[in-house]
């Protein structure tokens, strides 16, 4: 949520910054109109209350002098009724303003490149050599099916499209990756491991920005105001909802493994095969709470931690800065890590690392004190994938495939696979 004081004091400036995202921001003009009405109404109510006070004093004076005050009493009754009506209208306007404020996205940082789509994202760096196969590389869904480690048909029978059954060494590979990533972040990158609930309440989803704007993209539990998490960012960020942290605690860093659930309502027809876009998938999430002046530094640190996973696995990747039009709703700056996928001859997203600024902290009321006597300030929150597990499975199958269809296991994973070094 944006700082409403800044929005009111510099509306045109904020509007110009937000329009760098993708043009007109829905709800912004309505907010301005309503806020102007609110200010006018507050002034009117204050004038009416002042008038009521004056009339009350006049009535008291007349009564002291034992004079007729009936006409003034009638006038005061009318004024009181108008105040009551205006107060009700004011409450209605303020409720709508609060709802509108929840639908306005975050402001991009000044160094975020301007653009309208992913085509305008800026490449920052590359790592690793893409494999040079002497044969036509096969897509991961063909490899996994042939090895009998991925079963898309039975998953569709059990549930529907965009689900997968992992079998045998495929299931073991997924589990090995989760343990490898969690261990790496906890022991080498100094994160505190968290195992959060996979079901959260509405307040948590509002706190991190999924609701109210993106309710169609998440799964809601029928007859309960609970939601299946689309990412561990939701429960982990909300661990400190409504709290005031101590400045010396910051930065706070958590890593969490979770299964995630997304309806992918806006992705019909995209990535219908394989592991890239699933309704249910596993991911290791990184969440950081930071001092405001240190959050961009923390973004660089967190992005490096996600990169280290791909480096250790020997997977070629690149880092891109998302342009203004490709930023997510809550982000002020995002780096995407894109892993090389040989069958498509392109890089595909495997991690997004974002600085959210105080956007979530305002929604979830997460603050800190620099010292015991200082006024609480909003923290900055950051989150990133460290990394998406299913997409890592897909990348390993494709980048480590052999001509006979077997898959070499990356050396770093072999201790987690019982020293299995090849899938065949």
Curated annotation (Swiss-Prot):
EC numbers for this chain: 6.1.1.11
SUPFAM superfamilies attached to this UniProt entry: Class II aaRS and biotin synthetases, tRNA-binding arm
Pathway: Aminoacyl-tRNA biosynthesis; selenocysteinyl-tRNA(Sec) biosynthesis; L-seryl-tRNA(Sec) from L-serine and tRNA(Sec): step 1/1
Binding of ATP, residues: 262-264, 349-352
Any Gene Ontology biological process: selenocysteine biosynthetic process
Gene Ontology CC entries for this record: cytoplasm
HAMAP family in the record: Ser_tRNA_synth_type1 (MF_00176)
Protein name (Swiss-Prot/TrEMBL): Serine--tRNA ligase
Gene: serS
């Amino acid at each position: 949520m944006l700082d409403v004081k800044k929005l009111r004091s510099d509306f045109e400036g904020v509007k110009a910054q937000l329009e760098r995202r993708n043009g007109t921001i829905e709800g912004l003009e309505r907010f301005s109109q309503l806020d102007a009405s609110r200010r006018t109404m507050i002034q009117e109510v204050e004038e009416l209350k002042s008038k009521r006070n004056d009339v009350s004093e006049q009535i008291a004076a007349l009564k002291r002098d034992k004079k007729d005050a009936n006409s003034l009493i009638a006038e005061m009754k009318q004024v009181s009724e108008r105040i009551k009506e205006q107060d009700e209208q004011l409450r209605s306007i303020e409720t709508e303003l609060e709802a509108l404020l929840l639908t306005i996205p975050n402001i991009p940082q000044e160094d975020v490149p301007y653009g309208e789509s992913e085509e305008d994202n800026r490449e920052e760096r590359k790592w690793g050599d893409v494999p040079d196969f002497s044969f036509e590389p096969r897509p991961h869904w063909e490899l996994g099916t042939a090895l009998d480690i991925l079963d898309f048909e039975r998953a569709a029978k059990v549930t529907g499209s965009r689900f997968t059954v992992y079998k045998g060494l495929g299931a073991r590979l997924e589990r090995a990756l989760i343990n490898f990533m969690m261990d790496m972040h906890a022991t080498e990158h100094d994160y505190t491991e968290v195992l959060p609930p996979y079901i959260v309440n509405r307040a948590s989803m509002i706190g991190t920005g999924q609701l109210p704007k993106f309710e169609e993209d998440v799964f809601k539990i029928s007859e309960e105001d609970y939601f299946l998490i689309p990412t561990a960012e939701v429960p982990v960020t909300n661990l400190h909802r409504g709290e005031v942290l101590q400045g010396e605690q910051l930065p706070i860093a958590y890593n969490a493994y979770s299964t995630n659930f997304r309806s992918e309502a806006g992705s019909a027809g995209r990535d219908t095969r394989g592991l890239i876009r699933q309704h249910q998938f596993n991911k290791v999430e990184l969440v950081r709470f930071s001092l405001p002046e240190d959050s961009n530094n923390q973004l660089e640190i967190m992005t490096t931690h996600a990169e280290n996973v791909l480096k250790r696995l020997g997977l070629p990747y690149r880092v891109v800065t998302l342009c203004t039009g490709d930023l997510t709703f809550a982000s002020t700056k995002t780096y995407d890590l894109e892993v090389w996928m040989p069958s498509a001859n392109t890089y595909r997203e495997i991690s997004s690392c974002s600085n959210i600024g105080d956007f979530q902290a305002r929604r979830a009321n997460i603050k800190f004190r620099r010292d015991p006597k200082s006024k609480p300030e909003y923290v900055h929150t950051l989150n990133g994938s460290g990394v998406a597990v299913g997409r890592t499975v897909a990348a390993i199958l494709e980048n480590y495939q052999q001509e006979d269809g077997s898959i070499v296991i990356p050396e770093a994973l072999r201790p987690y696979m019982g020293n299995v070094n090849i899938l065949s």
